[in-house]
Curated annotation (Swiss-Prot):
Residue positions, PTM Phosphoserine: S342, S349, S350
Lineage: Eukaryota, Metazoa, Chordata, Craniata, Vertebrata
Membrane topology summary: Multi-pass membrane protein
UniProt keyword annotations, A-Z: Endoplasmic reticulum, Glycoprotein, Lipid biosynthesis, Lipid metabolism, Membrane, Phosphoprotein, Transferase, Transmembrane, Transmembrane helix
UniProt-recorded name of the protein: Ceramide synthase 4
Family annotation (Pfam families): Homeodomain, TRAM_LAG1_CLN8
Organism, as annotated: Homo sapiens
Glycosylated residues, chain numbering: N19
Topology feature Cytoplasmic, residues: 325-394
GO BP, sorted A to Z: ceramide biosynthetic process; sphingolipid biosynthetic process
Any one annotated GO CC term: endoplasmic reticulum membrane
GO molecular function, one term: sphingosine N-acyltransferase activity
């Protein structure tokens, strides 16, 4: 059963152009070609990268965040309340006012006290700035290293400057060790991101991030197996060119260097728009869609590969819209607003001031008159103006 599926899955017509077989890509006479089994090393490499990340965040990222002045906010802990906790975990984190009134009556609390409990309970689950800084600093280190390493690998290759050369003698293109190790490192890193996704800081575009990481892993796996390494390497380099800038923006933002953060974000926005909305469609998509089949007809891998690239481009457009909204706010107000993907800390003063304008529910169920808004409520600094990848690809 398994052998039959394996034989069907690796049919030449799925992976290779017409009239090309796997036999032509066997190593011979010192010529080495990519083989799908080479990628089995990516999983243990991902585990090694995870261990390196944990060590980096613990022994480098955390001390660095404190040295640079990144401080966690002091959060007021909620008083244990079984009824409210059960509703929070099973029914939702943001109950409507009728639900709040009912819960307040059940617990013998005022409406304002119940609102405050849910607000502080939500804040309790939000990640602290030092955790965000550690994650951003690890990704910054990897993306910058990967971009510099990839540029050094591809700088002297003809297809970096003329993407049409990706199809020169395709698929009979030999594998260079430097390109193999760079590709394997990228695949291992994205696998480690997928493994860590449930435990990392979650953004409002969490689903888009999951899709992006899965598409990236499938693209790298397919492109390596089908010897589409040349065009695949251009896709990787194009994404790495802006990702490290985004992570740098986050780090500076957590350090509260507003002017530096604004300047970096403008640079990142320009690089992101140019690489994802200009170079990617005009150089990558054009050559894979038109020039790749100039000498050979289309095949399943052609449609599959281009379909994944188009899905990646849709994610680029989605994140570009988020960036444009932030840029519009920047142009309007003169400083960068919080990242609209971020989960923002809620302050006690904001909702208490609003609640003071409406009657409050008392313990006995009677409505009380409006109370003056508190003037000494703690004001939490808005955290997380900028986030991760991608706003990426990735």
């Amino acid at each position: 059963m398994l052998s039959s599926f394996n034989e069907w899955f690796w049919q030449d017509r799925f992976w290779l152009p017409p009239n090309v077989t796997w036999t032509e890509l066997e190593d011979r006479d010192g010529r080495v070609y990519p083989h799908p089994q080479d990628l089995l090393a990516a999983l243990p490499l991902a585990l090694v990268l995870l261990a390196m990340r944990l060590a980096f965040e613990r022994f480098i990222g955390l001390p660095l965040s404190r040295w640079l002045g990144v401080r966690d906010q002091t959060r007021r802990q909620v008083k244990p309340n079984a009824t409210l906790e059960k509703h929070f975990l099973t029914e939702g984190h943001r109950p409507k006012e009728p639900q709040l009134s009912l819960l307040a009556a059940q617990c013998g609390l005022t409406l304002q006290q119940t609102q405050r409990w849910f607000r502080r309970r939500r804040n309790q689950d939000r990640p602290q700035l030092t955790k965000k800084f550690c994650e951003a600093s690890w990704r910054f280190l990897f993306y910058l290293s990967s971009f510099v390493g990839g540029l050094s690998v591809l700088y002297h290759e003809s297809w970096l400057w003329a993407p049409v050369m990706c199809w020169d003698r395709y698929p009979n293109q030999t594998l260079k060790p430097s390109l193999y190790w760079w590709y394997l490192l990228e695949l291992g890193f994205y696998l480690s991101l997928l493994i860590r996704l449930p435990f990392d800081v979650k953004r409002k575009d969490f689903k888009e991030q999951v899709i992006h990481h899965f598409v990236a892993v499938i693209l790298m796996t397919f492109s390596y197996s089908a010897n589409l390494l040349r065009i695949g390497s251009l896709v990787l380099l194009l994404h790495d060119s802006s990702d490290y800038l985004l992570e740098a923006c986050k780090m500076v933002n957590y350090m509260q260097y507003q002017q530096v953060c604004d300047a970096l974000f403008l640079i990142f926005s320009f690089v992101f728009f140019y690489t994802r909305l200009v170079l990617f469609p005009t150089q990558i998509l054009y050559t894979t869609y038109y020039e790749s089949i100039s000498n050979r007809g289309p095949f399943f891998g052609y449609y599959f590969f281009n379909g994944l690239l188009m899905l990646l481009q849709l994610l680029h457009v989605f994140w570009s819209c988020l960036i444009l909204r932030m840029l519009y706010s920047f142009m309007k107000k003169g400083q960068m607003e919080k990242d609209i993907r971020s989960d923002v800390e809620e302050s006690d003063s904001s909702e208490e001031a609003a609640a003071a304008q409406e009657p409050l529910q008392l313990k006995n169920g009677a409505a009380g008159g409006p109370r003056p808004a508190p003037t000494d409520g703690p004001r939490s600094r808005v955290a997380g103006r900028l986030t991760n990848r991608h706003t990426t690809a990735t």
